[in-house]
Amino acid sequence: MNIFNNNLHETDKEINEIIKHEKLRQSSVIELIASENFVSPAVLEAQGALLTNKYAEGYPSKRFYNGCEEVDKAENLAIERVKKLFNCKYANVQPHSGSQANQAVYLALLQPGDTVLGMSLDSGGHLTHGAAPNMSGKWFNAVSYSVNKETYLIDYDEIERLADLHKPKLLIAGFSAYPRNIDFAKFREIVDKVGAYFMADIAHIAGLVATGEHQSPIPYAHAVTSTTHKTLRGPRGGLILSNDEAIGHKINSALFPGLQGGPLMHIIAAKAVAFLENLQPEYKSYIQQVISNAKALASSLQERGYDILTGGTDNHIVLVDLRKDGITGKLAANSLDRAGITCNKNAIPFDETSPFITSGIRLGTPACTTRGFKEKDFVLVGHMVADILDGLKNNEDNSALEQKVLNEVTKLIELFPFYG
């Protein structure tokens, strides 16, 4: 058998069919999962390139394998482009994920048992910020800060009080479900008072930071981590940024050989492509549209009587609090899914329900904005979501309404382009 003549359709019909069906699913639903997006065909092409064949342990010009001349060029391009994008002095583009980017920073700056202070899961934080089931909660003495119980906004006074009390080695700013801006300068003030390191995890808002639509943490944080998908609209992966090159040197050693082995050179090439796209003027317009669309979505749901956490949004995330409506997040997300609208159940701050059930849903605008949705389209989407939620108030069997909304979704989504 000549492997170089094989294609997927002939080699593995089952996987080929799965990919075809997934393409159909992605093309036919309104995608509101806040952490998802659609990459360009150029990113897909780079990600599927033969660079996947190349082992390249180490860093450009310091590899443990020969034959790395071309992949060195690709990685250097990715590094230089992302440094320009975020206006920083140091970048590492090798992390396989945002979680591993965070782990590399921990490995570089902390010792087991050190205290870390991060946002609690139910307030919108991430597993890797000290949650008990995660490595960060097992290896370190994790302390959590919450949001204000009335406004649901970050409580900087509480963070300062906890920092004074616990003297963390690392203070973490960042979230996976928080719809408002973060004051990174205020975090740095707190850090300087207690002599801690400051890490900003901007996985969700990296695109906003890169385009100036959110305050940059680069001047304030010792290390900045992110994913390369979500609002950056690149391949799935991670990155680490800093203006402190001495810390950057520690992070390089922590990531390789400390945490990872060979980098994924096809993914790094795809990251470089995405960063080039992010440097174009139209990307800033895209991010501005993402934010405007989120505000339109939040307003349309508020008009229908639904509680939007914090009263609105500054970014791409809309959190719907369903406690007063007597609907669980799980029930709502499943019903919306059957109606062709994909989102996720999400905990609400101080949520007393199980994280597998939750009292809210998280909605996001990056993916549909990539397809061309504008504010008026998200107003329609908001009403579709509200229709489904209204139906659930009366009856958990929402099948008739789900079919009606699915028909509306189909008519709307057909107006917007997808991969050919």
Swiss-Prot record:
Which keywords does UniProt give here?
Amino-acid biosynthesis, Cytoplasm, One-carbon metabolism, Pyridoxal phosphate, Transferase
Which residues are listed for (6S)-5,6,7,8-tetrahydrofolate binding in this entry? 121, 125-127, 354-356
Record's subcellular location: Cytoplasm
The EC code for this enzyme is 2.1.2.1
* Matching Pfam families: SHMT
* Swiss-Prot/TrEMBL GO biological process terms: glycine biosynthetic process from serine; tetrahydrofolate interconversion
Principal cellular location given in the protein's record: cytoplasm
**Pathway note:** One-carbon metabolism; tetrahydrofolate interconversion; Amino-acid biosynthesis; glycine biosynthesis; glycine from L-serine: step 1/1
The cofactor required is: pyridoxal 5'-phosphate
Q: What class of enzyme is it?
A: transferase
Site (Plays an important role in substrate specificity) found at 229
What's a GO cellular component annotated to this UniProt protein?
cytosol
Provide the catalytic activity annotation: (6R)-5,10-methylene-5,6,7,8-tetrahydrofolate + glycine + H2O = (6S)-5,6,7,8-tetrahydrofolate + L-serine
Its Gene Ontology molecular function terms?
A: glycine hydroxymethyltransferase activity; pyridoxal phosphate binding
- Residues with the modification N6-(pyridoxal phosphate)lysine, per the entry, are 230
Q: What does the function comment of this entry state?
A: Catalyzes the reversible interconversion of serine and glycine with tetrahydrofolate (THF) serving as the one-carbon carrier. This reaction serves as the major source of one-carbon groups required for the biosynthesis of purines, thymidylate, methionine, and other important biomolecules. Also exhibits THF-independent aldolase activity toward beta-hydroxyamino acids, producing glycine and aldehydes, via a retro-aldol mechanism.
Q: Which PANTHER family does the UniProt entry name for this protein?
A: SERINE HYDROXYMETHYLTRANSFERASE (PTHR11680), SERINE HYDROXYMETHYLTRANSFERASE 1 (PTHR11680:SF35)
NCBIfam families registered for this protein in UniProt = PRK00011.1
| Subunit structure as annotated in this protein's UniProt entry | Homodimer.
Q: Which family does it belong to?
A: Belongs to the SHMT family.
User: What name does this protein carry?
Assistant: Serine hydroxymethyltransferase
Origin organism is Rickettsia africae (strain ESF-5)
Highest classification ranks of the organism: Bacteria, Pseudomonadati, Pseudomonadota, Alphaproteobacteria, Rickettsiales
